[in-house]
Curated annotation (Swiss-Prot):
Pfam families: SRP72. Its main location: cytoplasm. This is Signal recognition particle subunit SRP72. It comes from Saccharomyces cerevisiae (strain ATCC 204508 / S288c). The lineage of its organism: Eukaryota, Fungi, Dikarya, Ascomycota, Saccharomycotina. Belongs to the SRP72 family. Present with 11800 molecules/cell in log phase SD medium. One of its GO terms (biological process) is SRP-dependent cotranslational protein targeting to membrane, signal sequence recognition.
Length: 640
C-alpha cells in the first residue's frame, strides 16, 4: 500500500524530485528566506513541501516557528501543508484550531457547497478523523469525495480504499449509507481493506480468501512492507477462526524478519502473547512487561499507530499493570479511570477474594450511580457486575443493573446511548438465568417507550434493536416484535436477514423451511464455545444464592407451618391448666417427685432418696473384721 492516502493532493506543488534534490530545495529556500526574498509566501510553501517529501515533520514544525512572521502574514496560502504537518505529528489542538479557522461552517454545509478548493483540506481532515477515532465524519467525507470525482481529481482505487477504511472499525455506518465505490479485485489494496470489513462482521472465511488474494498480489509486486501488513492481518483472522498453529507460525516468521525495536515487531509480539493464558498468581508480570518492551511501546503514539491499535495496546498494558499491583493513574480513557477507582477500593487485586471485592464494589457503585450515571460510571458498573456474576450473586447483579437504567431514564427516555444498551444486554441474560420473565416484560415495556422517544433513530444501533425484537418474540408478543423487526428491515439496505424476513412475513414457517435455516449450524462447536441448550426451570441448578426476597418468603412459610403444628398440639389439651414451674429441673430434683418402693436411689445423685438398707451398707462403723484364712500355706520345695 502507499505510505499515505493523499496521493496527488500535493501534486499541484510541481515538485517531483529525488530525496537529495528535496534536501537541496529545502536549503535553497531557507537561504532565500533568510536573505529576505520578494515572494516569501511562495518560497516558504516550497520549503515546507520539500521537508514533507522527506518525512521530516519535526523539522517542518521548526521552520514554522522560525519564520513565524511569514506564517502570521501569509499563513492562508500554505494552510494545507500546515494541516498535513499537524496531522502527521498528532497535534490535535493545533490541527482543530487551524481547521476551524479555514472552514467556519459545519461539515454538512461544506459538503453541500462542494467547493473545489477545499478538496485537499477535506482529504487531510478525513485522514485526521480516522486516526483519532472520528469514524462517522471520516466516512461521510470519503463518500462525498468519491461521489464527486467526475474530473478524476483523485485515483478511483484510492477513493475506494479510503471509503472502506472507517468501516473496518465501525461497520454499522453501512446501515446509514451504502458504499458508492465499486469493488475492483485487481487492486490488492482494495482487497485488503475489504477483508477488514468482512472480518468485522464475522465473515472470517471470506476475509481469509480476500487476504490470500491480496498477499499474492503484493508478493507479485514485491512490496515487502505491504506483504508484512497483510500477513499480520491474516494471522489475526486465523486466530479468530481457531487456527492457532497457522497464526503462530506467521507471527514467528514476521518476528524473525522484522527489527526488534520496530513498531510492527512490537505489534507481532503483543499478538503472539495473546495466545498465552496468564494467571494472576503464577505469572511474572514484571518479566512479561519487559519482554513486551512496554517502555518502547510508550515512546510511540498516534504518529505510528492508528487510534484502534493504540487503544488496544494501552488496554493490554493497563491490564498487566493492574494484576502486577502497580499504581494506575486516572487518564482520559474509560478503562484507566475504572482501574484507578478499582485499585483504590481493593487492597490487593491478586490476593483479595472475589467475594470481598464484589461486596466493596457493589456498595461503592450503588452510591456512584445515585450521584449520576454519566462519565466513567459504566466502567465501574461493568466491573462490579462481572465480580457479582463470578460469585453467583445474581440478584445483586440484576439489582444494580436495574438501578443504573432507572437513574438514566429518570427524566426521559430520549438520551439512549451505548452504555444503556450494554446493561440491557446483560439484564436480558441475567433474567434468563434466574427465570424472571416478569422483570423481562417490564424492561421490554420501557424499551418500547425508548423506541417511541427516539422517533425512528433506531438505525444507529440496529443489532441491539434486532435483539429486542427477538426478546419480544420469546415472550409471545408477536405483534410488537413484527412491527419492530419490520422497521429494522427497512433500514437494513445491505445483506438481507432471512430469519428477520421470515418473522416479518405473514407466511407460516413449516418444518422443511425451519430445517433449512439451521442446516449449516455446527451444534458441537456451539457447545464447545460455551452455549448451553434451552432447558426448563425445573432442571436448572438450585445451588444459587438466596435473595432477601426469597429468604423472607421462606421465613414466612416456616412461621405458618409452626402455627399449624401448635394448633394440632393443643387439640384435646386443657389450656386452662398452667405448666409446672419446676419443669426445667431434673425429674428427681422436683418437689413432686416420689420414687417407687422397690426402686433403689442412685448412690451418687445429689439430693436423691435412699432406703435404710442402703444406708447400713454404707456405714463403715458397723462392718465386722475381715475373715482371716487359717489354712497354712504350702511351701514349695526348691529344686536342688
Amino acid at each position: 500500500m502507499a505510505k499515505d492516502n493523499l496521493t496527488n493532493l500535493l501534486s499541484q506543488l510541481n515538485i517531483q524530485l529525488s530525496q537529495d534534490e528535496h534536501s537541496q530545495v529545502e536549503q535553497t529556500c531557507v537561504k532565500l528566506l533568510d536573505s529576505g526574498c520578494e515572494n516569501p509566501a511562495d518560497v516558504f510553501r516550497r520549503c515546507l513541501v520539500a521537508v514533507i517529501q522527506q518525512d521530516k515533520y519535526q523539522k517542518a514544525l521548526h521552520y514554522l516557528k522560525k519564520f513565524k512572521h511569514i506564517d502570521d502574514k501569509y499563513g492562508r496560502k500554505f494552510a494545507l501543508e500546515k494541516l498535513y504537518i499537524f496531522y502527521k505529528l498528532n497535534m490535535p489542538d493545533e490541527f482543530n484550531t487551524l481547521y476551524t479557522a479555514i472552514i467556519t461552517d459545519d461539515l454538512d454545509t461544506v459538503l453541500k457547497k462542494d467547493i473545489e478548493s477545499l478538496r485537499g483540506i477535506l482529504h487531510v481532515r478525513a485522514q485526521y478523523c480516522y486516526k483519532n477515532g472520528l469514524y462517522q465524519e471520516a466516512f461521510k467525507i470519503y463518500q462525498h469525495l468519491a461521489s464527486h470525482n467526475e474530473k478524476d481529481q483523485d485515483s478511483q482505487i484510492e477513493l475506494s480504499c479510503n471509503e472502506r477504511v472507517p468501516l473496518s472499525v465501525a461497520t454499522e455506518l453501512m446501515n446509514r449509507s451504502p458504499l458508492v465505490t465499486p469493488m475492483d479485485e485487481s487492486s490488492y489494496d482494495l482487497l485488503f481493506n475489504e477483508s477488514f470489513i468482512m472480518a468485522s462482521v464475522g465473515k472470517y472465511d471470506k476475509a481469509i480468501e480476500l487476504l490470500e488474494k491480496a498477499l499474492q498480489g503484493a508478493t507479485n509486486e514485491g512490496y515487502q512492507n505491504d506483504i508484512n501488513t497483510i500477513k499480520l492481518q491474516l494471522s489475526f483472522v486465523l486466530q479468530m477462526v481457531g487456527k492457532t498453529a497457522q497464526s503462530k507460525e506467521i507471527l514467528k516468521g514476521l518476528l524473525q524478519e522484522l527489527k526488534a525495536d520496530s513498531p510492527f515487531s512490537l505489534i507481532c509480539q503483543n499478538n503472539l502473547n495473546a495466545f498465552v493464558d496468564f494467571s494472576k498468581y503464577n505469572t511474572n508480570f514484571n518479566l512479561l512487561l519487559r519482554e513486551l518492551n512496554v517502555e518502547k511501546l510508550n515512546t510511540f503514539n498516534l504518529q505510528t499507530f492508528t487510534h484502534e491499535q493504540w487503544s488496544n495496546i494501552q488496554r493490554n498494558v493497563l491490564f498487566l499493570r493492574l494484576f502486577n499491583n502497580v499504581k494506575i493513574h486516572s487518564q482520559e480513557s474509560l478503562l484507566s479511570r475504572t482501574f484507578d477507582k478499582y485499585s483504590k477500593l481493593v487492597d490487593n487485586v491478586t490476593l483479595e477474594s472475589y467475594k470481598t471485592q464484589a461486596k466493596k464494589l457493589y456498595h461503592h457503585t450503588t452510591k456512584t450511580i445515585l450521584s449520576g450515571t454519566d462519565g466513567s460510571t459504566i466502567g465501574i458498573l461493568l466491573l462490579t457486575i462481572q465480580l457479582l456474576i463470578i460469585e453467583k450473586e445474581w440478584e445483586n447483579a440484576i439489582r444494580i443493573g436495574e438501578l443504573f437504567l432507572n437513574e438514566s431514564w429518570k427524566s426521559s427516555f430520549e438520551k439512549f446511548n451505548d452504555s444503556q444498551a450494554i446493561v440491557c444486554y446483560i439484564l436480558f441474560e441475567l433474567y434468563k438465568i434466574k427465570g424472571r420473565n416478569n422483570s423481562k416484560s417490564v424492561l421490554l415495556k420501557k424499551l418500547g417507550s425508548v423506541r417511541v422517544q427516539l422517533s425512528g433513530k433506531i438505525q444507529e444501533n440496529i443489532p441491539f434493536w434486532k435483539h429486542v425484537g427477538f426478546e419480544l418474540l420469546s415472550m409471545g408478543n408477536a405483534k410488537e416484535s413484527k412491527a419492530l423487526l419490520r422497521e429494522i428491515s427497512n433500514f437494513s439496505k445491505g445483506d438481507a436477514d432471512v430469519l428477520v424476513d421470515r418473522v416479518v412475513s405473514s407466511d407460516s414457517l413449516d418444518i422443511a423451511q425451519g430445517i433449512d435455516l439451521v442446516r449449516d449450524i455446527d451444534i458441537d462447536k456451539l457447545i464447545q464455545l460455551g452455549v448451553k441448550p434451552l432447558e426448563s426451570s425445573a432442571k436448572r441448578s438450585k445451588n444459587t444464592a438466596v435473595s432477601k426476597v426469597q429468604k423472607r418468603k421462606v421465613l414466612e412459610l416456616k412461621k405458618k407451618r409452626k402455627i399449624k403444628r401448635l394448633e394440632k398440639f393443643l387439640q384435646g389439651r386443657d389450656t386452662s391448666k398452667l405448666p409446672d414451674p419446676e419443669r426445667w429441673l431434673p425429674l428427681r430434683d422436683r418437689s413432686t417427685y416420689r420414687p417407687k418402693k422397690k426402686q433403689q436411689g442412685a448412690k451418687q445423685t445429689q439430693g436423691g432418696a435412699m432406703n435404710k438398707k442402703s444406708e447400713q451398707a454404707l456405714d463403715i462403723s458397723k462392718k465386722g473384721k475381715p475373715t482371716v484364712n487359717k489354712k497354712p500355706k504350702n511351701k514349695k520345695k526348691g529344686r536342688k
